[in-house]
Every structure is written in structure tokens, then in C-alpha cells.
Regions:
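Ribonuclease/tRNase effector modules and their secretory precursors
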Residues: 1-80
Length: 80
């Protein structure tokens, strides 16, 4: 599966100092179906859980956005 980062996702990762390989590791270890998903994971080294929004179409995984989830839920692995 090919992983593509949107321009917005690249900017959020740079702003919040989230390494690209951290996001890729989380996504490679998940079984995701077609459609849009919200993923919340605890990541070592980050104060807050990391939220990643992705879309999967035709075996291409596009990261729409990613950021530390500072408010609300801290449940790991939430999928919508």
C-alpha cells in the first residue's frame, strides 16, 4: 500500500514536530478498509495522543491531517 501525505499533513507534521516515519509506522501496523478513518494513538515522546485522519482509495493511503489531540478523548485506536 502506497502512503501519500497531503500538503496540509506535511505542514502539520512539521509544525508539531511529528516524524514522518512515526506516522508511517502507525499506519503500516493497522488493517484499514476503503474509506475515511480517524485514528488516535498514544506515541512515545509526545505529551498528547496523536490523531491521524486518512483516506484509502484504490490501495493508496492518503494522510489528510495529523496533530496532537490536546482536548477530549484519550482512547487508543479509535476508528470512525
Amino acid at each position: 500500500m502506497q502512503i501519500i501525505f497531503s500538503r496540509h499533513a506535511k505542514r502539520r507534521a512539521r509544525l508539531y514536530k511529528i516524524a514522518r516515519f512515526t506516522i508511517e509506522d502507525i499506519l503500516k501496523n493497522m488493517e484499514l478498509s476503503q474509506g475515511e478513518h480517524e485514528i488516535v494513538k498514544e506515541v512515545k515522546g509526545l505529551k498528547y495522543p496523536l490523531k491521524i485522519v486518512v483516506r484509502i482509495e484504490n490501495d493508496i493511503l492518503t494522510v489528510i491531517t495529523n496533530y496532537p489531540l490536546k482536548k477530549g478523548r484519550k482512547n487508543e485506536g479509535i476508528l470512525r
